[in-house]
């Protein structure tokens, strides 16, 4: 095991503070409407220019192991805020820096670190409760656009396109962000339920100009096994042919003579049919088949529930207004499922989202929820260069997270004003002893730091602005973009309550841990021996040169 270097007390905390300040100073330059850019060098290709706090934080590694620990802990603050609300990383970093700097001064002055932390935690809980009281629901499209605009560093076009996407697919709908091919941002919306499986044979295509198979008013046969024997399918095919309706078969697979017979029947016009593989794998496939069954008012033909293909009747089949199959995707439009059953299924998926601890599972469940509840919108980001594209895409993703958070927990006045107004909750708050009171006072000063930093980045005097904002009340604040004071909500400067809350909680959590640090352990740097002179072989016979 490699030898370790151990630092204690003040010398450990001083080193850690250097790392905290290096990372926070780089990140906080990006805060607010007049935040500056940070250029990140890449080992290959052009450097990246960004105003996204978490992107800057991720790039920073320091040479000194103890300083690096401080930097990595602040990076953890940014990623914690990002995980909780998808935004607010820069605000969280600024708050953490203020808490750690003030806290370590108090520790150096002889305060008890544990009591300081208790005071900070008590004050944080009170501020979080006050933020909840300050928040207003974010229901209309205008408010959603304003939140998106602020989060995308005051880019109106991004806020508007996100609001439009949410309007079209609903609050539960999936909105994905992709790189576009033009200069402008574009929005495309897929109505109905779409899954990434296409037709099993090109012979099902009935629109050769677009290479799609379109079925009007089809019946849907949902089967959770492979179909290779046509005899199993005959009873259903005959019943469908009598009904004179098209048929879509969604099964684990359709192969061999079963697929060949379906193709022949389709080409001869005996029965209009198309087949597609069921989406997903394993248990997820079963769940998605059940989703399609609920959406279309059908039943999955499964031996697990005692149903077989031979005994299937028209009552077991789902109904839809239209189905479109391309080579890669299948879209079911206007399924005939009962609203009450769809709502019950949505509720069940929501409960699973709450319970799961896996990010991957959560993402897949969100997709299933969207397919049942709303639809899918794709925002294609347009930009002039590759560098701009990456930067813009990161901002669109941030704005999207922020608007979702706003819909979830409401909005508060932006520009750091909400935290200043939430100070009211801790003006008279008292701890159990004097050291806890110092912790509460410390947080009282720290919550002003985002407002001060936004002002400093705009080139104004932070103390003057902070005092004027504190003298005001309600939504009164400072618009750093225009240099004016006024009602922040009327000026369209809104922050999601969830983002502000998550930023403060992440900063207080890690800030409190850093204040209570007493020892730090790191690997000793290895002393590499100086490289020797290379062998001068082949240089013999030079004796006569003297």
UniProtKB/Swiss-Prot annotation:
It catalyses: ATP + H2O + a folded polypeptide = ADP + phosphate + an unfolded polypeptide. Keywords: ATP-binding, Chaperone, Cytoplasm, Isomerase, Nucleotide-binding. It is found in: Cytoplasm. The keyword Transmembrane does not apply. GO terms for cellular component: cytoplasm. One of its GO terms (molecular function) is isomerase activity. ATP binds at residues 30-33, 51, 87-91, 415, 479-481, 495. Its EC number is 5.6.1.7. One of its GO terms (biological process) is protein refolding. CDD domains: GroEL. Belongs to the chaperonin (HSP60) family. PANTHER family: 60 KDA HEAT SHOCK PROTEIN, MITOCHONDRIAL. Together with its co-chaperonin GroES, plays an essential role in assisting protein folding. The GroEL-GroES system forms a nano-cage that allows encapsulation of the non-native substrate proteins and provides a physical environment optimized to promote and accelerate protein folding. Forms a cylinder of 14 subunits composed of two heptameric rings stacked back-to-back. Interacts with the co-chaperonin GroES. This is Chaperonin GroEL. It comes from Pseudomonas putida (strain ATCC 47054 / DSM 6125 / CFBP 8728 / NCIMB 11950 / KT2440). The lineage of its organism: Bacteria, Pseudomonadati, Pseudomonadota, Gammaproteobacteria, Pseudomonadales.
């Amino acid at each position: 095991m490699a030898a370790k270097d151990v630092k204690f007390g003040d010398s450990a905390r001083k080193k850690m503070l250097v790392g905290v300040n290096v990372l926070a100073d780089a990140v906080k330059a990006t805060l607010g409407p007049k935040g500056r850019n940070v250029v990140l060098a890449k080992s290959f290709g052009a450097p990246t220019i960004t105003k996204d706090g978490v992107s800057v934080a991720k790039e920073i590694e320091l040479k000194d192991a103890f300083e690096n620990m401080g930097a990595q802990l602040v990076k953890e603050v940014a990623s914690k805020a990002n995980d909780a609300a998808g935004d607010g990383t820069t605000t969280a970093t600024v708050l953490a820096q203020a808490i750690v700097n003030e806290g370590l001064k108090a520790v150096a002055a002889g305060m008890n670190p544990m009591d300081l932390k208790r005071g900070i935690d008590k004050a944080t809980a009170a501020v979080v409760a006050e933020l909840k009281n300050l928040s207003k629901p974010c229901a209309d499209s205008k408010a959603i656009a304003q939140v998106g605009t602020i989060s995308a560093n005051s880019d109106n076009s991004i806020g508007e396109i996100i609001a439009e996407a949410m309007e079209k697919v609903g609050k539960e709908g999936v909105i994905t962000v992709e790189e576009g091919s033009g200069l402008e941002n574009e929005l495309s919306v897929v109505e109905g339920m779409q899954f990434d499986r296409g037709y099993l044979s090109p012979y099902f295509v009935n629109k050769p100009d677009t290479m799609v198979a379109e079925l009007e008013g089809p019946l849907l046969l949902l089967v959770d096994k492979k179909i290779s024997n046509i005899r199993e399918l005959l009873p259903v095919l005959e019943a469908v042919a009598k009904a004179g309706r098209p048929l879509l078969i969604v099964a684990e697979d359709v192969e061999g003579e079963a697929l060949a017979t379906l193709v022949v029947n389709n080409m001869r016009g005996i029965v209009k049919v198309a087949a597609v593989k069921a989406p997903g794998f394993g248990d997820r496939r079963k769940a998605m088949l059940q989703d399609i069954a609920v959406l279309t008012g059908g039943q999955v033909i499964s031996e697990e529930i005692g149903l077989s293909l031979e005994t299937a009747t028209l009552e077991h089949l789902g109904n839809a207004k239209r189905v479109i199959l391309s080579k890669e995707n299948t879209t079911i439009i206007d399924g005939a499922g009962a609203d009450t059953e769809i709502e019950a299924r949505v509720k069940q998926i929501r409960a699973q989202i709450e319970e799961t601890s896996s990010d991957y599972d959560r993402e897949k469940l969100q997709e299933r929820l969207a397919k049942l509840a709303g639809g899918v919108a794709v925002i294609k980001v347009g930009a002039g260069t590759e560098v701009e594209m990456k930067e813009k895409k990161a901002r669109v993703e941030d704005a999207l997270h922020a608007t979702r958070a706003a819909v979830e927990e409401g909005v508060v006045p932006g520009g750091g004003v909400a935290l200043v107004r939430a100070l009211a909750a801790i003006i008279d708050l008292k701890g159990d002893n004097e050291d806890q009171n110092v912790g509460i006072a410390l947080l009282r000063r720290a919550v002003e730091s985002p407002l001060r930093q936004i002002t400093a980045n705009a080139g104004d005097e932070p103390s003057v602005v902070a005092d004027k904002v504190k003298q005001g009340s309600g939504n009164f604040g400072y618009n750093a973009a225009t240099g004016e004071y006024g009602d922040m909500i009327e000026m369209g400067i809104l922050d999601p309550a969830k983002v502000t809350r998550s930023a403060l909680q992440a900063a207080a959590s890690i800030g409190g841990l850093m204040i209570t640090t007493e020892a730090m352990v790191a690997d000793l740097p290895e002393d590499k021996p100086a490289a020797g002179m290379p062998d001068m072989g082949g240089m013999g016979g030079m004796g006569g040169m003297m």
